Amino acid sequence: MTQEKKKFDAEVGKILNLMIHSLYSNKEIFMRELISNASDACDKLRYLSQSHSELVASDSNFKITVKVDKDNWQIIIRDNGIGMNKEDLIDNLGTIARSGTANFLKSLSGDSKKDNMLIGQFGVGFYSSFMVADKVTVTSRKAGEDTVHVWESDGLGEYIVSDSDKEFTRGTEIILHIKKEEDIFLDHFRLKHIVKSYSDHVAVPIYFFDEAGNNEIQLNSASALWTRPKSEITEEQYKEFYKSLSYAVDDPWITMHNKNEGAIEFTNLLFIPSSKTFDLFHPDRKRRVKLYIKRVFISDENIDLIPSYLRFLRGVVDSEDLPLNISRESLQHNSVLEKIKNAITKRVLGELRKKKEESSEEYNKFWANFGGALKEGLCEATTDHEKLLEVCIFRSALHNKMISLDEYIAGFKEEQNTIYYLSGDNPDKLLSSPQIEGLLSKNIDVLLFTDTVDDFWVNVNSEYKGHAIKSATRSDIDVEQTTSQSEDKNTHSKKSDDEYKLLTDYFKETLGKLVKEVKISKKLTSSPACLAVSDSAMDIRMERFLIEQKQITAASAKNLELNPKNKIIEKIFNDLKANNKNNEELVNLIFDQACILEGEPVADTGAFSKRLNDIVQKAIL
């Protein structure tokens, strides 16, 4: 018998160290993980057997068994699934083979309390065995192969892989050598209760040996939960299925269990989590809904079953109309799958619309968790943008709460026809921006966009239900024309741009290429000036993002808008009319201030500091 000793990958070592020294109170999740792995092994072989029936010729009835050997301090879990050969044992148990485990590692903080809580959040598969066992022995024979292999470790840095002469049928057996301090798990009644709680939704029969170790008792109905009538499923069963499926500790916020019996037949059991999923913005943008065909698991990877922007969904979809022998490649551009995807998307958006109307408080929590991902759909060409925008909510500057676009439109002033927004990183900073002071002074609301994706979707969604969506940074905004003629007008006499030509020319001459144009603002009420862009130009925040990503090399020159009602601007204008052109330093300071307020870099920070010091010095002397 050949035997090979190997060291765990460093990443696995970190996990094992945490498992061995775990203070996590809910250690029974090791059974959830091992049952889930055994069920997956059976699902994989069931799928393969559709095209390779010889793999199950000797035993086509899948099952999982659990046994307690109290005398030897052992718990034994056995399945007759696909099994593992030597390479599989090394890859699956000696290295990081699962993205969820890799994400678990990235989330470790070094704080033992926080890290122990992560065990429940992520589930860490097979390695959770070491919370209750000081040694684990895995015996396995892969379907279609004759050799039996044994993997064994105490979790302290090394493991042994060997061939075995043991008589062993297809599948995997895991023996947990239970720690002395964890003897509670050797209690027959307690372990039976734990196994039953984690097995009710599993589609593979799970058998538990009696105390004598002779007779098997089936603990679950072995029917897929989603195939049962809703009236026969309790809320607790839905919750447990969700937690087992998604390795979650939270309860689902929304549960959608539907049977579609139209032109396309399928069943979906989908969940929207109540807490933010750890991998929501992972670069892979993986979707976590499993596809079954006639109760046979097909895949949960690289299948376009739900749109990427709904990747926070967890659950299963079971189709009656797809052939069991379909290849994963054929699923990429499959018309039946596309129809299922469209139906699910419509159903999910309908549920969100209903929830938004029922409870704004609950919906706000959902939006804080998943709104950023949902808005990504507004950038996709195939999305029904209007339906998606109906479930989007944004921060209202006027009311300081989250509102929908329909609520915004319902609050239009008499002659208003435009939806205004301002984008930035911080809502509090946006509220103090000069860009929106004029609009707010006329009780015209402005939506505050703070997600990076906002700057992208507004470029492909210029209107909503016939109303333009416009950035408050645009040069052509006139708050007087936006509001009703019956409203009180500012007592300041309104001078045309021509009357202020002396002023705008002076600013342009002083600032030169630093600005594209200098204009009289029709939206400022108190601030002296602000930066602005023309309707055809890129939004300021979007341009800054592209510079950070090195998509463009330099910022473009912006327009500078002046407020002639501001005392500083008024003084400069009066000086010009008196032929006094000695305000160049003040002009530059006003421009620098406008840049800072917009988050734009100041061209010369040293000169800016000197100008500011000079003006302060003059004021106090």
From Swiss-Prot:
Residue ranges, annotated region (C): 545-621
Top-rank lineage group of the source organism: Bacteria
Localization: Cytoplasm
Keywords: ATP-binding, Chaperone, Cytoplasm, Nucleotide-binding, Stress response
Gene Ontology molecular function: any one: ATP hydrolysis activity
PANTHER family: HEAT SHOCK PROTEIN 90 FAMILY MEMBER (PTHR11528)
Similarity field: Belongs to the heat shock protein 90 family.
A as annotated region, ranges: 1-328
Chief location category: cytoplasm
The name this protein goes by in its record: Chaperone protein HtpG
Residue span of region Disordered: 475-495
Metal-binding among keywords: no
Annotated spans, B: 329-544
Statement: the UniProt record of this protein carries the keyword Chaperone: yes
Biological role: Molecular chaperone. Has ATPase activity.
Biased composition (Basic and acidic residues): 486-495
GO cellular component: cytoplasm
Assembly, per entry: Homodimer.
Gene that produces this protein: htpG
InterPro entries in UniProt: HATPase_C_sf, Heat_shock_protein_90_CS, HSP90_C, Hsp90_fam, Hsp90_N, Ribosomal_Su5_D2-typ_SF
PROSITE patterns: HSP90
